Protein backbone atom coordinates (compact mmCIF):
# COMPACT_ATOMS: atom_id res chain seq x y z
CA UNK A 1 0.00 0.00 0.00
CA UNK A 2 1.08 3.53 -0.65
CA UNK A 3 1.27 6.19 2.00
CA UNK A 4 -0.01 9.63 1.04
CA UNK A 5 -0.40 12.73 3.17
CA UNK A 6 -3.85 13.82 4.25
CA UNK A 7 -3.42 17.03 2.24
CA UNK A 8 -2.66 15.02 -0.91
CA UNK A 9 -5.67 12.76 -0.34
CA UNK A 10 -7.92 15.76 0.31
CA UNK A 11 -6.73 17.38 -2.92
CA UNK A 12 -7.27 14.13 -4.84
CA UNK A 13 -10.83 13.89 -3.49
CA UNK A 14 -11.50 17.52 -4.41
CA UNK A 15 -10.42 16.77 -8.00
CA UNK A 16 -12.44 13.53 -8.05
CA UNK A 17 -15.55 15.34 -6.80
CA UNK A 18 -15.13 18.15 -9.33
CA UNK A 19 -14.79 15.65 -12.20
CA UNK A 20 -17.82 13.71 -10.99
CA UNK A 21 -19.89 16.89 -10.60
CA UNK A 22 -18.87 17.96 -14.13
CA UNK A 23 -19.94 14.56 -15.46
CA UNK A 24 -23.28 14.79 -13.65
CA UNK A 25 -23.97 18.20 -15.20
CA UNK A 26 -22.79 17.43 -18.73
CA UNK A 27 -23.29 13.67 -19.11
CA UNK A 28 -19.66 13.42 -20.26
CA UNK A 29 -17.94 10.92 -17.95
CA UNK A 30 -14.57 11.08 -19.75
CA UNK A 31 -13.00 13.59 -17.34
CA UNK A 32 -14.00 11.37 -14.41
CA UNK A 33 -12.77 8.16 -16.09
CA UNK A 34 -9.44 9.85 -16.85
CA UNK A 35 -8.78 10.02 -13.08
CA UNK A 36 -8.10 6.27 -13.06
CA UNK A 37 -4.78 4.62 -13.90
CA UNK A 38 -4.63 2.54 -17.07
CA UNK A 39 -4.63 -0.63 -14.95
CA UNK A 40 -7.24 0.47 -12.39
CA UNK A 41 -9.85 -1.88 -10.99
CA UNK A 42 -13.45 -0.83 -10.28
CA UNK A 43 -15.47 -3.21 -8.14
CA UNK A 44 -19.21 -2.65 -8.48
CA UNK A 45 -21.25 -5.09 -6.42
CA UNK A 46 -24.16 -5.29 -8.86
CA UNK A 47 -22.51 -4.80 -12.24
CA UNK A 48 -19.26 -6.68 -11.68
CA UNK A 49 -15.56 -5.85 -11.71
CA UNK A 50 -14.06 -3.66 -14.42
CA UNK A 51 -10.34 -3.83 -15.12
CA UNK A 52 -8.61 -0.97 -16.86
CA UNK A 53 -9.51 2.68 -17.39
CA UNK A 54 -11.17 2.09 -20.76
CA UNK A 55 -13.47 -0.63 -19.39
CA UNK A 56 -14.39 1.68 -16.51
CA UNK A 57 -15.08 4.49 -18.98
CA UNK A 58 -17.29 2.30 -21.18
CA UNK A 59 -19.29 1.01 -18.20
CA UNK A 60 -19.83 4.38 -16.44
CA UNK A 61 -20.91 6.06 -19.67
CA UNK A 62 -23.53 3.38 -20.32
CA UNK A 63 -24.76 2.97 -16.75
CA UNK A 64 -25.24 6.72 -16.21
CA UNK A 65 -26.89 7.45 -19.61
CA UNK A 66 -30.46 7.08 -18.26
CA UNK A 67 -29.76 9.38 -15.29
CA UNK A 68 -28.10 12.66 -16.35
CA UNK A 69 -29.59 14.47 -13.34
CA UNK A 70 -28.26 12.06 -10.72
CA UNK A 71 -25.86 13.55 -8.18
CA UNK A 72 -23.73 12.02 -5.43
CA UNK A 73 -23.53 14.28 -2.37
CA UNK A 74 -21.25 12.94 0.34
CA UNK A 75 -22.49 12.44 3.90
CA UNK A 76 -19.08 11.76 5.45
CA UNK A 77 -15.45 11.16 4.44
CA UNK A 78 -12.57 9.30 6.11
CA UNK A 79 -8.93 9.53 5.01
CA UNK A 80 -6.53 6.60 5.58
CA UNK A 81 -3.08 8.04 4.92
CA UNK A 82 -1.25 4.76 5.66
CA UNK A 83 -3.09 2.92 2.89
CA UNK A 84 -3.70 5.78 0.46
CA UNK A 85 -7.43 5.24 0.87
CA UNK A 86 -10.40 7.58 0.89
CA UNK A 87 -13.70 6.23 2.18
CA UNK A 88 -17.02 8.03 2.01
CA UNK A 89 -20.74 7.57 2.10
CA UNK A 90 -22.67 9.31 -0.63
CA UNK A 91 -26.26 9.39 -1.76
CA UNK A 92 -27.22 8.27 -5.26
CA UNK A 93 -29.68 11.13 -5.64
CA UNK A 94 -32.30 11.95 -8.24
CA UNK A 95 -34.11 15.28 -7.87
CA UNK A 96 -37.86 15.24 -7.40
CA UNK A 97 -39.23 15.33 -10.98
CA UNK A 98 -42.43 17.26 -10.22
CA UNK A 99 -41.46 19.49 -7.32
CA UNK A 100 -38.00 21.18 -7.32
CA UNK A 101 -38.31 21.78 -3.57
CA UNK A 102 -39.66 18.27 -2.93
CA UNK A 103 -37.64 15.52 -1.31
CA UNK A 104 -35.10 13.80 -3.58
CA UNK A 105 -35.16 10.12 -4.39
CA UNK A 106 -31.94 8.57 -3.11
CA UNK A 107 -30.14 5.60 -1.63
CA UNK A 108 -26.78 5.40 0.20
CA UNK A 109 -23.51 4.01 -1.10
CA UNK A 110 -20.14 3.49 0.57
CA UNK A 111 -17.12 4.07 -1.66
CA UNK A 112 -13.47 3.13 -1.09
CA UNK A 113 -10.95 4.84 -3.37
CA UNK A 114 -7.26 3.89 -3.44
CA UNK A 115 -5.05 6.75 -4.54
CA UNK A 116 -2.08 5.90 -6.78
CA UNK A 117 -0.52 9.36 -6.74
CA UNK A 118 -0.07 11.90 -9.51
CA UNK A 119 -3.80 12.67 -9.54
CA UNK A 120 -4.84 9.09 -10.39
CA UNK A 121 -6.75 6.33 -8.60
CA UNK A 122 -5.82 2.65 -8.87
CA UNK A 123 -9.04 1.31 -7.38
CA UNK A 124 -12.64 2.12 -6.53
CA UNK A 125 -15.12 -0.14 -4.80
CA UNK A 126 -18.77 0.77 -4.32
CA UNK A 127 -20.56 -1.04 -1.51
CA UNK A 128 -24.36 -0.99 -1.58
CA UNK A 129 -27.28 -3.11 -2.72
CA UNK A 130 -28.41 -1.63 -6.04
CA UNK A 131 -30.54 -4.67 -6.87
CA UNK A 132 -32.72 -3.71 -3.91
CA UNK A 133 -32.14 0.01 -3.28
CA UNK A 134 -31.69 1.30 -6.83
CA UNK A 135 -34.74 -0.54 -8.17
CA UNK A 136 -36.98 0.77 -5.38
CA UNK A 137 -35.65 4.33 -5.66
CA UNK A 138 -35.80 4.53 -9.46
CA UNK A 139 -39.28 2.98 -9.51
CA UNK A 140 -40.54 5.56 -6.99
CA UNK A 141 -38.88 8.37 -8.98
CA UNK A 142 -40.55 7.21 -12.22
CA UNK A 143 -43.91 6.90 -10.42
CA UNK A 144 -43.47 10.54 -9.32
CA UNK A 145 -42.97 11.61 -12.95
CA UNK A 146 -39.27 10.96 -13.57
CA UNK A 147 -38.24 10.13 -17.12
CA UNK A 148 -35.19 8.13 -18.16
CA UNK A 149 -32.96 10.02 -20.59
CA UNK A 150 -32.02 6.76 -22.33
CA UNK A 151 -32.87 3.10 -22.07
CA UNK A 152 -30.86 0.91 -19.71
CA UNK A 153 -27.66 -0.14 -21.51
CA UNK A 154 -26.05 -2.34 -18.85
CA UNK A 155 -27.52 -5.34 -17.03
CA UNK A 156 -26.69 -6.08 -13.43
CA UNK A 157 -24.39 -9.08 -13.12
CA UNK A 158 -25.51 -9.82 -9.55
CA UNK A 159 -29.06 -9.69 -8.25
CA UNK A 160 -30.73 -10.26 -4.87
What are these regions (language model features)?
Residues 29-84:
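A solvent-exposed, acidic/Ser-Thr-rich amphipathic alpha-helical stretch
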Residues 1-34, 38, 155-160:
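Short, low-complexity N-terminal intrinsically disordered segments enriched in polar/charged residues
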Residues 2-7, 61-160:
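A beta-strand edge to alpha-helix "cap/lid" segment located at domain peripheries
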Amino acid sequence: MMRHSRAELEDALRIYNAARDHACKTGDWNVWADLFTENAEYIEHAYGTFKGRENIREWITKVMAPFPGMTFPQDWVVFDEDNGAILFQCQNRLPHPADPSGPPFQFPNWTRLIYAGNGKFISEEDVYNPARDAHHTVSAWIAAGGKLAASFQVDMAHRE
